[in-house]
A protein has these predicted regions:
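Active-site nucleophile and cofactor-binding loops and adjacent substrate-binding regions
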Residues: 1
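Phosphate/pyrophosphate-binding betaalpha-module
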Residues: 4, 12-78
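Short acidic, glycine/serine/threonine-rich loops at helix termini
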Residues: 5-9, 40-41, 48-52, 94-99, ...
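Surface-exposed charge patches
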Residues: 9, 28, 73, 110, ...
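Well-ordered secondary-structure scaffolds
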Residues: 60-63, 67, 77, 81-266
């Protein structure tokens, strides 16, 4: 996924956690825990892999109808009854142009509804990095911080917005998502999900062998913080891959100290 990173790469920084589940394991965990994050099995939407290979050699990787069908074919094949999509735009997103991101979101919502799946999409801005962490272990660490009741305000805001949409589609529009987050229920589910997939939720995440601090060269206010250069820098450090078979350095990444609008000192 280049500079955008992959969800499974991030979760695989957790010692013991496994992404591959059989169908029986998937449904058993969904019933017992209520949450699963796993890799799509090869038999889920087998035509998608072949179509992607064709897109790669025909210059149609950025075709919105083909992107939408690739994403939605897997979601529909899962037997999903309701689906919430987080469609990002901006310099740090796969689809940078807001108009094209909106077109992609509308296309996927239409496909979902045509297939009988209750589908909504949120358009979210990735011109500025989300949160303060960039990289695999870094972002997992920040996610755990949010589940513990802390973390950056923008990550909390997006998390709550997505949760509200999910619960509304599930017939629970009045559920108090803030209370579940603050009261520890969300963290309990996270720990149960990680444990069910072989991971240790208490294990230390990979730490870098060395680090370098970048400081302000003058006093002032940070007025801009473009996501793309940070993503590329983390990718070059090893947090992403250029080819599917490339290894990922789990501890590689960047931790930001401030967001735009913050005062900095030399």
């Amino acid at each position: 996924l280049g500079h955008t990173g992959g969800t499974l790469d991030k979760l695989e920084t957790i010692p013991g956690w496994r992404a591959s589940l059989s169908n029986d394991e998937f449904y058993a965990q969904l019933r017992s825990v209520g949450a699963v994050i796993c890799a799509a099995g090869s038999g889920l939407a087998p035509a998608d892999g072949r179509l992607y290979s064709l897109r790669d050699i025909t210059g149609t990787v950025e075709s919105i109808p083909l992107i939408a069908s690739s994403i939605m074919s897997k979601k529909i094949a899962e037997g999903t009854a309701a689906l919430v999509l987080d469609v990002k735009f901006g310099s740090g997103a796969f689809m940078q142009d807001p108009a094209r991101s909106r077109e992609l979101a509308e296309t996927m919502v239409r496909i979902g509804k045509d297939a009988g799946v209750k589908t909504v999409a949120l358009l979210t801005n990735m011109n500025v990095p989300l949160g303060l962490a960039i990289g695999n272990a870094n972002e997992v660490r920040e996610s755990v911080e949010v589940l513990s009741g802390g973390g950056p305000a923008d990550v909390i805001e997006l998390t709550l917005a997505l949760a509200r949409e999910m619960l509304a589609l599930a017939g629970q529009p009045d559920a108090d998502v803030e209370a579940h987050l603050a009261g520890g229920k969300a963290m309990d589910t996270w720990r149960a999900m990680i444990s069910a997939q072989g991971g240790d939720p208490d294990a230390a995440l990979p730490a870098p062998r060395e680090s370098q601090q970048v400081v302000a060269d003058r006093d002032g206010v940070l007025v801009a913080q473009h996501a793309l250069p940070f993503g590329i820098a983390a990718w070059r450090l090893g947090a992403g891959r250029a080819r599917k078979e490339d290894p990922v350095v789990h501890a590689a990444g960047i931790d930001l100290a401030v967001k735009p609008g913050a005062a900095v000192k030399k």
